[in-house]
Amino acid sequence: MYKKGIYKILTNEPLTDAVWRMTLAGDTQWISAPGQFVNIALEGKYLRRPISICDYDDRSIALIYKVVGGGTEQMSRMLPGETLDLLTGLGNGFSTKNDARRPLLVGGGVGVPPLYNLAKRLLAEGKPVQVVLGFNTASEVFYEDCLLYTSPSPRDPKTSR
């Protein structure tokens, strides 16, 4: 089930030259699992933009997106206080109800954001999580520090690239 709503931009900041993190305030009751996504309507664009949810709580949603075209470039220019029309609670997401004792999460590029909330959920359930991240270049790396704490034996980020 999904919900359409208007969400207020709280933050919109670059993480790298091409990757941005946007935090939105609004109703999150239809988001039920890590790995779900939203569809964003943008002024002057016919199609909505699907963006995976990085994190959420009962009042806000964090999205991470890469600027790859006109729509995401338009998003990168948006300022706190502006609003967006979203469809939320889309996709099945990831289930954490399984017998996995040591889950291995693998993601790269814009496939990394949905793993953040999944890792948080699994850790809250007492499951030690291992994370493998991939990026095209070192300049494109983001959220490595946020996900590094989930690894059972933290490595020096400078030598692990």
Feature locations, PLM:
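Short internal beta-strands
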Residues: 129-136
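Conserved beta-strand elements of the Class I
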Residues: 104-106
